[in-house]
């Protein structure tokens, strides 16, 4: 599989991740005011909730594999900010596996902090790519963080893909359901809360 | 797992894996016909006709100390002389020929160089090449795997007029002048001595000041 194909695949997945995060956010926010949206949100939670933490493991595995592909096969040298994001993403694989196994609400909430930390680094890295002077007015001759290795669909750079993965993991942990699945409720407020204990 | 699972639970994880495989196939199909490695031509290889992105250079004289913060120890030192060639093979020399010079070291992948080149190109287009001072650019740190490759195409796109010396793959010309960051400017007086070295994006006014100092009037 060529580097072009891999970056295109990761770009497709990043767009899917962004769409999922946006959908969950819209359903959650709009569901507070609109009962019909709240019911939809409840259905979404019941649909995603039981397997959300396992999906989060899959997202972390794909992101880690993509990162290793870029550095080890495509030979895109990771910069300092790339390494910070790696330090966050790589341990997420075993941590999320543990979360998926234990399915404890407390663990899920604590684990949510990790991808949010990664997302903040990715967000800063994206800003440095667009505004290189944020870091420095010169380029480090070896490997500046402002260097854009990949750009798909006019906006998807490697840190943007990482941000999408971190946000999707955090979102999946948020909707992940640690409790047994209850039958659907007719009460929209209960439905929105889903199976949150 | 200590909780019960719904018997009708949708197999999301296997479906997600399947979706990744399908998207991978779509990505392979859509990427067919492009470069196998997505990186274009290798550094130093023939791109079009006799264009080469890196060329051998030879350096005579002592290398300048690395450029750093504070007082520049290179000011007043004789600059090394570099002989090499442009992308098309035409001979280019940075030599002590009695003409003041401003050298610009550029890396195709550096976003600051990418911003600086149009500024300098527009300045030359509007005001013409500065009289009595030779502008020489050095395309260095050329790496085929990095963005905005090849530098010859980039500079042509930008309407770049100054002479370009294509540095070798080791960046010998850049090292000889003590480059530590991009973009990098060196002003040399008529005696071939270093007047000033500066790195980073420069405004038109700063470039004009640098040219004036090379002339000895700044």
Regions found by a protein language model. Give the residues of each.
Chain A
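Secretory/periplasmic and organellar redox-cofactor proteins
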Residues: 1-80, 89-92, 96, 100-197
């Amino acid at each position: 599989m060529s580097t072009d194909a891999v970056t295109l695949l990761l770009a497709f997945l990043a767009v899917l991740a962004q769409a999922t995060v946006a959908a969950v956010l819209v359903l959650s926010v709009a569901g507070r005011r609109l009962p019909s949206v709240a019911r939809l949100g409840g259905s979404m939670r019941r649909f995603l909730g039981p397997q959300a933490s396992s999906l989060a493991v899959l997202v972390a595995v794909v992101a880690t594999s993509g990162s290793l592909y870029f550095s080890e096969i495509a030979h895109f040298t990771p910069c300092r900010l790339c390494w910070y994001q790696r330090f966050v993403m790589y341990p997420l694989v075993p941590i999320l596996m543990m979360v998926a196994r234990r399915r404890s609400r407390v663990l899920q909430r604590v684990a949510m902090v990790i991808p949010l930390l990664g997302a903040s680094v990715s967000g800063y890295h994206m800003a440095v790519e667009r505004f290189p002077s944020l870091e420095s007015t010169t380029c480090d001759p070896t490997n500046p963080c402002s260097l854009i290795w990949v750009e798909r669909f006019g906006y998807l750079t490697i840190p943007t893909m990482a941000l999408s993965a971190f946000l999707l993991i955090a979102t999946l942990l948020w909707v992940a359901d640690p409790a047994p699945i209850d039958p659907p409720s007719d009460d929209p407020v209960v439905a929105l809360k889903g199976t949150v204990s | 797992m200590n909780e019960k699972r719904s018997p009708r639970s949708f197999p999301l994880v296997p479906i997600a894996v399947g979706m990744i495989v399908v998207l991978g196939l779509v990505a392979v199909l859509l990427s067919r016909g492009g470069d196998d490695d997505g990186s274009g031509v290798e550094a130093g290889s023939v791109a079009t006709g006799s264009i080469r992105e890196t060329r051998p250079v030879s350096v005579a004289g002592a290398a300048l100390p690395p450029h750093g913060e504070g007082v520049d120890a290179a000011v007043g030192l004789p600059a090394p002389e570099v002989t090499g060639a442009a992308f098309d093979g035409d001979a280019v020399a940075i030599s002590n020929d009695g003409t003041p010079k401003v050298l610009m070291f550029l890396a195709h992948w550096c976003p600051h160089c990418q911003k600086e080149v149009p500024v300098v190109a527009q300045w030359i287009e509007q005001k013409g090449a500065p009289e009595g001072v030779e502008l020489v650019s050095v395309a260095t740190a050329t790496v085929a795997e990095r963005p905005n490759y090849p530098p010859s195409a980039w500079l042509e796109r930008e309407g770049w007029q100054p002479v370009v010396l294509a540095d070798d793959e080791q960046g010998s010309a850049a090292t000889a002048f003590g480059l530590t960051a991009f973009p990098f400017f060196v002003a040399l007086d008529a005696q071939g001595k270093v007047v000033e070295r500066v790195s980073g994006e420069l405004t038109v006014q700063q470039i004009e000041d640098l040219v004036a100092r090379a002339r000895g009037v700044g």
